[in-house]
Structures are given as C-alpha cells and as structure tokens.
Regions:
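Divalent metal-coordination and catalytic microenvironments
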Residues: 9, 29, 51, 62, ...
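Di-metal (Zn2+ and/or Mg2+/Mn2+) metal-binding site signature of metallo-dependent hydrolases
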Residues: 53-77
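C-terminal cap of metal-dependent C-N hydrolases
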Residues: 311, 389-396, 400-401, 472-519
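Divalent metal-binding pocket/active-site signature
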Residues: 176-233
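Divalent-metal coordination cores built from histidine and acidic residues
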Residues: 71-183, 271-273
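Histidine-rich, glycine-flanked metal-binding segment
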Residues: 1-5, 10-57, 74, 482
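Acidic, glycine-enriched loop/beta-strand segments at the rims
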Residues: 11-23, 375-382, 386-387, 436-445, ...
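Active-site neighborhoods of metal-dependent hydrolases
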Residues: 132, 138-140, 144-164, 170-191, ...
C-alpha cells in the first residue's frame, strides 16, 4: 500500500530527459514505484494528475531564510512551499548562523534583520543544526559557512587584512564546520566587512572546501563597473584551487554596464573552469541603502558609517562624490523596509528628496541616519535581455535569492519583500518557459532540480527515480503564474497544485497543510 499514489501524471524527471506519462507510488518518504496503470486501490491517498506535470521538488541554491531568521519565525516557509520549493541552501553571500566565534559574527545579518528576535543558543555548526532539528521546518535545509560570519566574529569591525595566525584560525573553524555537515563556504565580497579580504585569503579557504569536495558560492566584489575584475578574480580563485564554484545572482547593474554581462559570461566560458551562476527572473534587484554610498564610508562597520555621516564636512564630501560618480538611477530606487519610520516604505528616493526639498544624495544620507543604517531598497537596474540570456545559458541555474514568508507576516508589518519570495519559480516557468519559450520544460526543470542538487552535492534528491526522496511538485502548466507585485508581494502564485516533501503533502490542492516534513541536510 502506497502512502500517496499519483495517477496519470506527465513526468518531467529533472534529468533533462523527455516527458513521459506514468503513475508514481510513494512509501516511507521515498519514490517506491514508477509504472503505468498502478491500481488506485493501492494508494491510501490517490491524486489524479491527468494533464499535469509532475517534477522533482524545486531546489533553491541561493536562499536567505536562515539569515533573515524566517526559518525560525515562520518555520513552515509557506511562500517557498507554495511556489514549489522543497529544499533550500542557506549560509549564502558571506553570512551564516554558524559557527560563531563571538556575537560579532551575527552582525553580518544586521543589515537584513534584528538578531534579537530569536534565542541563538549555539556556537558550533553542529549545535546550530541540532537546534534547527528541534523546531520542525516545512522544507529541507542545507547550509554553507559564511566567510563574513567567521571573519567578523574573529576581528570584529576592524577593516584590515587578516594576520597569518587569524587566517589559520578561520581555516580550522571552516574545517570543523565541514566535518560537522556544512556544504561549503560563501563570500559576500561586495559588503563592507569583506572588502579587505584578499584573494589570497579566499584561495586558502577555498582549498579547504575543495578538500572536502564542497561548494564555494560568491556574491562577487562588484556588479556594476567592478563586474569584470570581480569575475576575473573568481576565475583566478577557481584556477588556483579547482573548487566547485557558484556565482550568486550574476548581473550587470545600471544601463551603462549592461554590455558587461555578456563579457562576464564569455570570461567564464573561455576559461572552462568549474563555475556556474544563478539568475533570478526579474529586472528589479534588492539590496541595502548604504550600497549607494562610496565604499570608504562603510569602512569599519555601521557605527563608523553613521559617525561619518553625522560629520557635516564628511557628509558634504560624500554628497559631492555621489553626484560626480552618478552610479545609480535614483528614480528607479524604492524603499522596501524602514524599521524606524515606516512612512517611507514604498516611496521612491526621488519622491522623498522632492518632498523635503533637498538633493537625492542628501535624502539618502538622512534616511540612513534616521534609520540607524537599516533600510533596504528595490533597484530597477537590470536589463531584460541580460536576464533572458542568463536564464537560458547552459551554465546557469535559477534561484530566488529570497526568504520564506507567509501572509500573516504582512498583516503584522508593512515591510515590502521582493515578490521573488512568493513567485520566483512560477514566474520563470510561466513567463520564460510556457509563454516565451525561452527554453523547454525539460531543461527548465533541470535548472531548478537535478542541476542544483548535483552542484550542491545533495544525495538522492532532484530526480524522479525509484529510491529517491519523495520531494515532488504537481503543476498545472495552463495555470502556472506568479501574482505578487512590488506594491503587494504577499500573494501566492497559481498553478502549483501539490507539493510533497519527504513523502508528506505540504501543499494540497493549493492549500498549505502545515505538515512540516522538512529535514536538516548534512554533507555526506
């Protein structure tokens, strides 16, 4: 007797193979049988799936549910399940929740959320995983080690290169975490506290990851005028170490830099290194407000940043540099979160400046001072053509760069989250696959299932194959669509009919069940 029997589904198996029709029997959390004409009497629960696509559960290799802390505050991760995500990889962009050398390691997540909202009662990576097991979560979770978490925990807010002894300590901490189940290392080299990390420092740590056959993911040093040097640095790291590498959310920000996207991909292709990259299906990105400032302003951390901006002479210098450089199109930047003054949420930076009768640059500085540096923004700065080229490229995977939420979160707060938190994968499948035929369904599903599973190093997930874990998604291809907007992102998508996590129904006919069947995954 099967726990769940799915009848007459069109199977897209995740391996970029041709579709076929079959029944699937699920028992004890695994795919037990794939065959035609399994008697419906053999299923405790039978789902009739005629004309629907059955795929492996989607694997999001660029998630921030851990460092945004929603994995704890919203453990069912409704918005991810409703878009078909069954497994996420956390610890990205240089920030993870373990291992912690000191409480300073957690400062790396302050730009996104308040660490004080949960009780962090761990230090080691193993203790972190053990704590997660106690709360029960709706999706499978794997994690990298954040480079900035290690670095900041060790030298706090000091803006300098590491001493040899400090690098050795970091290396030993990384080794221990890898032994305890971490899947690899991530860097956030664009953020202020990692800017002083040398290529040599990253190379030494990447060698350790390579020794464990782990994964190195990187938010590269720059995505505008710095894009090409940042790509070249990544290629250099891979050539020196051979480490399996993923460039997170590859993009060229700002119209002046759009041609660099093609150049960046050509550099990756030409060098034939073990590098992939991920793309999200939007031209609007999200970040923190302070990235609009010259790099030197953020040196030494938030305290130093605010201290500098309060100094009238330094403030004047910052404004002058911003006006001379003109790196961003300010009329395309919207305030997404503003914890202290919520009246700014949803407004363009230019609107705020106009209302106050000051320059946009001064408005940005004032916003940072009022909010104590904790404002996030949306930037409409990407090229649609570049997004398409990235999505269709043979080296790309699709990732959300998001966190999991639910509708109740919006009822408590007025913050705007990026709509990718609710609809990245349905948008990709609807807009770029079903409607625009940018790529076929088989290749598209590979890019969000077995491809990421192989890249991360997940075992027995990402394929519809006998003996594999029963993480599955049933899709109505005629209905699939995202609904969230930047004005109202808190809307679940259409067309993801059923989601099964480890053999349990997490979404039943587009309704969240609250089953919480997710598992904490460790590197084998």
């Amino acid at each position: 007797m099967y726990d769940i029997l799915i009848k007459d589904a069109i199977i897209i198996d995740g391996g970029n193979n041709a579709k076929y029709q079959a029944d699937i029997g699920i028992h004890n959390g695994k795919i037990n049988k794939i065959s035609k004409n399994i008697d419906a009497k053999n299923g405790k629960r039978v789902i009739f799936a005629k004309d629907m696509y059955l795929t492996p559960g989607f694997i999001d290799l660029n998630s921030h549910s851990d460092t945004f802390l929603t994995l704890f505050t919203i453990p069912n991760q409704d918005s991810l399940l409703r878009q078909g995500i069954t497994t996420i990889l956390g610890g990205n962009c240089g920030s993870s929740l373990a291992p912690l050398v000191s409480e300073d390691g957690l400062k790396a997540i302050q730009k996104w959320t308040d660490p004080g909202q949960i009780n962090l009662n761990w230090l080691t990576f193993q203790e972190f995983l053990d704590s997660l097991k106690k709360i029960k979560i709706g999706i499978n979770f794997a994690s990298l080690v954040g480079h900035s978490t290690l670095r900041r925990g060790l030298i706090k807010d000091e803006f300098r290169e590491l001493k040899p002894k400090e690098l050795k300590i970091m290396a030993n901490m990384l080794k221990t975490a890898m032994k305890q189940g971490a899947f690899g290392l991530s860097t956030g080299l664009a953020y202020s506290h990692a800017k002083m990390a040398t290529t040599k420092e990253i190379v030494e740590l990447a060698k350790i990851v390579k020794g464990f056959n782990g994964l190195y993911t990187t938010h590269i040093r720059g995505e505008a005028e710095e894009l090409i040097p940042a790509i070249e640095e990544t290629v250099d790291i891979v050539k020196k170490t051979g480490v399996n590498t993923e460039i997170l959310h590859l993009k060229a920000m700002g119209e002046n830099h759009w041609p660099n996207m093609k150049k960046a991909i050509e550099i990756i292709e030409k060098n034939k290194t073990n590098i992939n990259f991920d793309i999200y299906p939007y031209t609007v990105t999200g970040s923190v407000l302070y990235i609009l400032l010259p790099d030197w302003v953020a040196e030494g951390g938030k305290t130093q940043l605010l201290k500098r901006l309060k100094d009238p002479s330094i403030k004047e210098k910052v404004i002058r540099e911003m006006q001379e450089k003109k790196s961003y199109e300010y009329d395309k930047i919207i305030v997404a979160t503003s914890p202290i003054n919520r009246a700014f949420i949803g407004k363009k930076i230019t609107e705020i400046a106009k209302a106050q009768e000051i320059s946009v640059e001064e408005a940005i500085i004032n916003l940072l001072l009022i909010s104590e540096g904790r404002i996030s923004i949306f930037l409409d700065t990407l090229s649609e053509e570049n997004v398409k080229a990235g999505l269709a490229h043979k080296l790309s995977f699709i990732a959300s760069d998001s966190a999991g939420y639910n509708i109740k979160y919006y009822q408590k707060k007025s913050d705007l989250v990026h709509p990718r938190c609710f609809g990245a994968f349905p948008r990709f499948l609807n807009k770029y696959v079903e409607k625009e035929h940018l790529l076929g369904w088989e290749e598209a599903i590979y890019k969000i299932t077995y491809g990421p599973a192989q890249k991360i190093g997940l075992k027995n997930r990402g394929l519809i194959k006998k003996g594999y874990r029963a993480d599955l998604v049933l899709i109505n291809p005629n209905e699939i669509a995202d609904k969230g907007t930047f004005e109202n992102p808190y809307q679940f998508p259409r067309g993801i009919k059923y989601v099964i996590v480890n053999g349990k129904l997490a979404v039943d006919n587009e309704q969240i069940t609250g089953e919480k069947a997710g598992q904490i995954l460790k590197r084998a």
